[in-house]
């Protein structure tokens, strides 16, 4: 049984939390299924709005299809990371956001 199948089985059995949803979102994003990833990552940040890694991955999942929503996810993630003192995560999302904004300016 694959990791994704195991995580889906846990979810079906009633386990639902930020870490499980993050794991599913990450697995679906790596399986090139960003739409499914977005659904799970949104639930992850609903469970834990301070989960900066989930905000970062949500932005990545949204980047191609919904750049404005990706930017908003990264802004939320930057705020969450800064609130926790996670400077590295905040910096990474600031870089992603700047690249996205530069790309939008060129289009």
Please identify what each model-predicted range represents.
Residues 13, 46-47, 64, 80-84:
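Structural marker of alpha-solenoid helical repeat scaffolds
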Residues 34, 67-68, 87:
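TPR-repeat structural position
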């Amino acid at each position: 049984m694959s990791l994704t199948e195991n995580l889906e089985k846990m979810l079906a059995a009633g386990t639902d939390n930020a870490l499980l949803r993050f794991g599913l979102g990450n697995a679906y994003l790596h399986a090139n299924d960003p739409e499914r990833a977005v659904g799970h990552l949104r639930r992850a940040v609903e469970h834990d709005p301070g989960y900066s890694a989930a905000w970062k991955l949500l932005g990545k999942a949204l980047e191609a299809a919904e750049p404005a929503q990706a930017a908003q996810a990264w802004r939320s993630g930057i705020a969450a990371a800064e609130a926790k003192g996670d400077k590295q995560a905040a910096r990474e999302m600031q870089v992603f956001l700047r690249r996205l904004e530069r790309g939008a300016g060129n289009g």
